[in-house]
């Protein structure tokens, strides 16, 4: 198994070993009481009350296992899947008193009841009753009656989460509960079914990418088959890897869908640990798709111009809506993919080979980079300076653990004609646990001011400790550092609003411009107003 390897390597070869003896005893006794109470319920309440009671039980055991841990910042327990969607080992686990007034059952039950009441409120006034159907998503024509108006799906994201293996943690308890009698067909197997799960799994599958793409396409083709000509498909997507993008967009296009637009939705609280510690996922991307019948064959030279126009339109739309800079990327990607997915196939003019979605996204990055450089009137910057400005514009000044995904930044480098590994060797880019951290002047002890505008800027910021003459010597050697500094301040206004909200490094850039005799504007004035 894939996720199971994490705990098998620690000697946990049975699910009961995920609990200590005290936890096992408490859970088993509670389950016995639930079973007894369930048997005494009237027929009308037997099923619903048993179902919701077991949801409470599941919530409780999630926080009472040897993989639960104490979160010192919150002063409370964190559940088994709080760090990430995985069996994350904790050497020093925490546990709760399941019968305490403010913990265990008395904590889990009210939270489940609150969620139930919210669902009831949201469904109030709906003219039909929701129906829950268990089945293979690739058999929608069998599961559904009639033609749906829309399908909204949050599919598995490539290899991001191994749902079936994680579900086994709860399944083994539910199978031993009254639910196995209420829903016998659901609990026939010893563990959850693994075959046919639409994920990329390097352990179970010989060719994970091919199998994932094939199964995803089967599902999307089934969606296309049950939707009418005016039907809509909405796909939620959070994976940032290029393989996942490529698989999803190809599958959508091949199944007969066109991406109409893409919007970022920030769906999780900032304290959500598996999001906070995994900077690759900061929002859910909602892809709005419409059905299409066939499509023309396109040549990249023509499609590329269309991509450029749509990306610039999308960026302007995002700015009018007040979306932050990083969300401009997402909206622009949606526009670019909309162009691409409208064609049956896009071919390279020289080789005649098929152009893949990744190349389209790279073109979108290149168009956005040119637009930002033009907007801030820093066209004379070298490539490193342009990259530094764009990184700060889109991602700000994050910590190492909060930095963007390495692959995402690598593609931005390539779009500007830079070698990301070369920047890494220079110490400007730091690869940290799959993320790309952009070094500040304080991180870099020795720089050659003449190497680039970024090196010049960092050298000048360091030289401020020595006085004006030292700064002027650096500026004389690399005069375009002024241009980069102005661009960074202008981007700072776009991102942070005013100088008071600037991060430390950017505040130092403002000080540097002051030392050089430049008056930095207040508020959010544009660069052309500043320099005009």
Region roles according to the model:
Residues 213-229, 254:
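A short glycine-rich, Lys/Arg-flanked "PGG" loop and its adjoining helix->strand segment in the class I
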Residues 244-254:
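Conserved helicase motor "Helicase C" RecA-like lobe of SF1/SF2 P-loop NTPases
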Residues 27, 146-166, 223-226, 238, ...:
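Conserved proline-anchored active-site loop of SAM-dependent methyltransferases
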Residues 202-212:
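The substrate-binding groove and active-site-proximal loops of carbohydrate-active enzymes
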Residues 1-147, 163-204, 219, 243-244, ...:
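Nucleic-acid modification enzymes, centered on SAM-dependent nucleic-acid methyltransferases
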Residues 59, 234-241:
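Conserved short loop/turn motifs at secondary-structure junctions
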Residues 45, 49, 222-229, 233, ...:
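Conserved, well-ordered alpha-helix/loop/beta-strand core segments that scaffold catalytic motifs
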């Amino acid at each position: 198994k894939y996720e199971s390897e994490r705990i098998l390597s620690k000697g946990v070869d049975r699910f009961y070993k995920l609990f200590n003896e005290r936890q096992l005893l408490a859970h088993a006794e509670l389950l016995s009481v639930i079973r007894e109470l369930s048997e005494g319920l009237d027929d009308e309440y037997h099923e619903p009350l048993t179902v919701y009671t077991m949801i409470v039980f599941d919530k409780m055991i999630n926080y009472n296992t040897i993989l639960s841990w104490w979160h010192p910042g919150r002063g409370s327990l964190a559940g088994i899947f709080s760090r990430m969607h995985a069996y994350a080992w904790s050497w020093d686990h925490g546990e709760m008193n399941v019968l305490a007034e403010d913990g265990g059952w008395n904590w889990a039950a009210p939270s489940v009841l609150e969620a139930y009441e919210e669902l009831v409120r949201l469904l109030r006034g709906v003219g039909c009753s929701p129906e829950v159907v268990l089945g293979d998503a690739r058999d929608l024509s069998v599961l559904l009656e009639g033609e749906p108006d829309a399908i909204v799906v949050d599919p598995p994201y490539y290899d991001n989460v191994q749902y079936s293996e994680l579900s086994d943690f709860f399944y083994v308890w539910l199978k031993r509960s009254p639910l196995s009698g209420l829903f016998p067909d659901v609990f026939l197997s010893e563990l959850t079914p693994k075959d046919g799960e639409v994920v990329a799994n390097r352990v179970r599958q010989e060719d994970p990418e091919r199998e994932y793409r094939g199964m995803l396409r089967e599902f999307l083709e089934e969606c296309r088959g049950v939707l009418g000509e005016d039907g809509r498909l909405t796909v939620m997507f959070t994976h940032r890897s290029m393989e996942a993008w490529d698989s999803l967009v190809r599958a959508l296009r091949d199944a007969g869908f066109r991406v109409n637009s893409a919007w970022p939705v920030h769906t999780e609280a900032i304290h959500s640990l598996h999001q906070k510690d995994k900077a690759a996922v900061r929002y859910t991307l909602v892809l709005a798709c419409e059905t299409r019948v066939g499509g023309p064959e396109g040549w990249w030279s023509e499609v590329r111009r269309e991509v450029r126009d749509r990306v610039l339109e999308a960026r302007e739309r995002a700015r009018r809506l007040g979306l932050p800079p990083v969300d401009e990327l997402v909206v622009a990607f949606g526009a670019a993919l909309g162009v691409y997915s409208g064609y049956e196939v896009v071919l390279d003019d020289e080789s005649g080979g098929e152009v893949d979605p990744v190349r389209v996204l790279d073109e979108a990055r290149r168009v956005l980079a040119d637009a930002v450089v033009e907007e801030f009137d820093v066209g004379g910057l070298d490539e490193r300076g342009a990259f530094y400005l764009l990184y700060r514009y889109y991602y700000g000044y994050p910590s190492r653990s909060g930095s963007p995904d390495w692959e995402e930044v690598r593609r931005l480098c390539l779009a500007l004609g830079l070698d990301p590994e070369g920047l890494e060797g220079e110490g400007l880019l730091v690869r940290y646990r799959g993320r790309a951290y952009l070094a500040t002047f304080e991180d870099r002890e020795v720089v050659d001011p003449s190497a680039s505008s970024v090196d010049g800027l960092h050298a000048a910021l360091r030289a401020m400790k020595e006085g004006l003459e030292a700064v002027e010597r650096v500026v004389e050697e690399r005069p375009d550092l002024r241009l980069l500094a102005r661009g960074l301040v202008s981007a700072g206004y776009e991102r942070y609003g005013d100088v008071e909200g600037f991060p430390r490094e950017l505040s130092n850039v403002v000080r540097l411009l002051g030392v050089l005799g430049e008056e930095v504007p207040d508020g959010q004035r544009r660069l052309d107003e500043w320099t005009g």
